[in-house]
Amino acid sequence: GGVYACAIVALIDCAEYYDPSFYSDSLGTTFWRLWNYTGSYYDSNNSAQGYTNNDKLCSGFKQYMSTRGQAIQTYEQSAPTWMQYKTNADNWNMSLFCAGIIDTTTGMRSGHTMSVQGYALLEPIGVPNEEIKVLGVHDGWNTYARYLNFYFSNYTDTYGAFFG
């Protein structure tokens, strides 16, 4: 076995995008460097599950990128807006979307972090003047893009990390 940490997978997506020499290190080396720079830690009940505090995403990624010779601008925000993600994507930059929901099995909050690579505006059939705003994300489990409703009503909290 190994360990999985969604925030680290999301940051690996960003590192690959911003670092022209990304492939000079192994994926494992990159994973553990980002793990260390972000202060990620193991779940005390499940050593295969890692956690990263949201407020360590930008500082840890910036530190990692500096070791790769890349200067990067970052900012973060609790409850980020749609326009922040849209503007960042329109400027060809990556960001992270972090969201909490209530796990129906345990009744406890569960969180997930995903890299954001774009967005779309969807118009439901038969609903004039309605628009659903979705983020194009890598969910960390699949190899293809997923589309996430930005205004999903069951998020308990959201957090954004923006790079440029």
Language model features with spans:
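Active-site signature of cysteine proteases
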Residues: 98-164
